[in-house]
């Protein structure tokens, strides 16, 4: 259950790791480096944005865009109507691109690992697990 307290914690913790241009760039690079290292079979999905080179401007921009999408959803976690509209928008984009539902599970696992690295003992994994489950369910094609 992604209740009010969990939503607040997720928003607050996300703000700690993903605010400001430097934090966003650093977080994105760390996330995608680990994600594609753990899932080399998925590099081909990012061919259009030079996924074989996560340091390329094309991939850097794409990586930030993906995480900015997550940022936009987390930012409205406590605004039910806007949250629903944002999820529907992202679902349409991912359906159009043929994104497989299981990719969201892989993404979530990696996200939790990176958040744990960044936040240490302050990471509320239960809050993230419950709220990310709602987010992923709303976006999965």
From Swiss-Prot:
Binding site for heme b: 94
GO molecular function list: heme binding; iron ion binding; oxygen binding; oxygen carrier activity
Disulphides: 2-131
Signal sequence, renumbered to the chain: none
Keyword Disulfide bond: yes
GO annotations of cellular component type: extracellular region; hemoglobin complex
rRNA-binding found in the keyword field: no
Keywords: Disulfide bond, Heme, Iron, Metal-binding, Oxygen transport, Secreted, Transport
Domain of life: Eukaryota
Localisation per UniProt entry: Secreted
Domain Globin residue range list: 1-141
Main localization, broad class: secreted
InterPro entries linked: Globin, Globin-like_sf, Globin/Proto, Haemoglobin_extracell, Mb-like_M
Membership in a protein family: Belongs to the globin family.
Subunit structure: The giant hemoglobins of worms are formed of a monomeric subunit and a disulfide-bonded trimer. This subunit is monomeric.
Protein's UniProt name: Extracellular globin-1
Native source species: Metaphire sieboldi (Earthworm)
